[in-house]
From Swiss-Prot:
Residues 2-48 form the F-box domain. This is F-box/LRR-repeat protein 8. Directly interacts with SKP1 and CUL1. The lineage of its organism: Eukaryota, Metazoa, Chordata, Craniata, Vertebrata. Keywords: Ubl conjugation pathway. It comes from Mus musculus (Mouse). It comes from the Eukaryota.
Length: 374
């Protein structure tokens, strides 16, 4: 067996090594010259996931640092509360910025809680540097960063990354500092953008109209998160603008996430009939039955996934049964309260495309796991 491994072609070894964690990859390079050569193969590095769980020198020895040139798509994970982890993440991003022409995709993810009053200036500064240098960047996903994102970042991406296809800024920060004017500049600078994630307050009627312009590339996904005080006060996006956008891009899907900060009147402003809602997440402190019934009336043709976090009630159960009867294309339903058996029966009977559901008939220990439909 040892001889077989020793005689494997470099291309085969590279396919084996590409899924190794970075630290294990560094160990493999010390086995023999053939393994070291395979570990430096571009196949290993083209699409890379890196978890920053130690100092950079232990994670990425100097003799492997040149391999960063091969990275096209990177998923970088770190723990903001651990100094070595965030230091390594910052150094890696800074190193990428200095050799970024090949970078096509960047996704950042935080594990654990961030320290109190941590604004993430080190990480965000490195992201700014990447945006200023990675002129061929296609995909930037910052949904899992816990920091407040602002106009500076959006304008840096607009100026430095004209080839962007997707940009997700709809993170879980408590404050939204991205103004609608910055989003307009981004859309003007990035004509090929196909997917965009924002807080609702960052969106405007002018942005919807620009996305509907004849010269735009097909637009596929708009994810809007409504979770900040700014979102609750945001100007309404008129139904006629949504209708025009849907007509211009028939395949457009909208994801709406409504959080407890929204009063009932704000929810009424946000839920417009012409919005092509494919994913709806309701985690409201007020009325939930009304939005579920609104979705039944207006989103039956487009709704693919519904998530409800609310207290159980006969009215909610009835609304869910009515939705099941109308939304035949539904693929996921997740309700985080105990439901009566007829709710489960309704979704099983009327939704033939259902792939997973969370519909519990009695209380269970958390976290509740979805049931997969085979």
């Amino acid at each position: 067996m040892g001889e077989l491994v020793d005689n494997l072609p470099e291309e085969v070894l590279a396919l084996i090594f590409r899924d190794l964690p970075l630290r294990d990859l560094a160990v493999a390079t010390r086995v023999c010259r053939a393994w070291a050569a395979a570990a430096a193969n571009s196949t290993v590095w083209s699409d890379k996931s890196i978890s920053c769980d130690c100092e950079l020198e232990d994670l990425l020895p100097p003799y492997l640092s040149s391999c960063l040139d091969h990275i096209h798509n990177l998923r970088l994970e770190y723990e903001p509360s651990k100094k070595p982890s965030r230091g390594t993440a910052t150094e890696l991003l800074t190193a990428l910025a200095s050799r970024a022409p090949r970078l096509r995709g960047l996704r950042l993810e935080c594990r654990g809680e961030k320290p109190l009053f941590d604004a993430g200036q080190d990480i965000l500064g490195a992201v700014h540097a990447v945006c200023g240098a990675a002129h061929q960047l296609r995909h930037l996903d910052l949904r899992h960063l816990p920091y407040t994102l602002d106009d500076t970042l959006v304008l840096k991406a607009a100026a430095g990354c004209p080839e962007l296809r997707s940009l997700f800024l709809d993170n879980h920060a408590l404050v939204n500092s991205v103004q609608p004017t910055s989003v307009l500049k981004l859309l003007e600078a990035c004509p090929h953008l196909r997917a965009l994630g924002l807080h609702l307050a960052s969106m405007s009627r002018a942005a919807l109209e620009l996305l509907a312009a004849p010269h735009r590339s097909p637009f596929a996904l708009l994810a809007l998160r409504c979770a900040c005080p700014e979102d609750a006060r945001a100007s309404p996006l008129p139904d006629e603008a949504w209708a025009t956008l849907s007509c211009r891009h028939p395949g457009l899907e909208v994801e709406l996430e409504l959080e407890p900060v929204l009063p009932d009147e704000a929810v009424t402003r946000i839920l417009q009939p012409a919005v092509p809602v494919a994913v709806l997440r309701l985690n409201l402190s007020g009325d939930t039955v009304g939005p579920v019934r609104f979705a039944t009336r207006h989103y039956a043709e487009t709704l693919r996934a519904l998530e409800v976090r609310a207290s159980a009630s006969p009215e909610l159960h009835t609304a869910l049964e009515e939705l099941a009867a109308r939304c035949a294309g539904l693929r996921e339903i997740h309700c985080f309260c105990v439901v009566r058996p007829s709710v489960l029966d309704a979704f099983r009977a009327h939704c033939p495309r259902l792939r997973s559901y969370t519909l519990k008939l009695k209380r269970e220990p958390h976290p509740w796991r979805p049931t997969l439909v085979r």
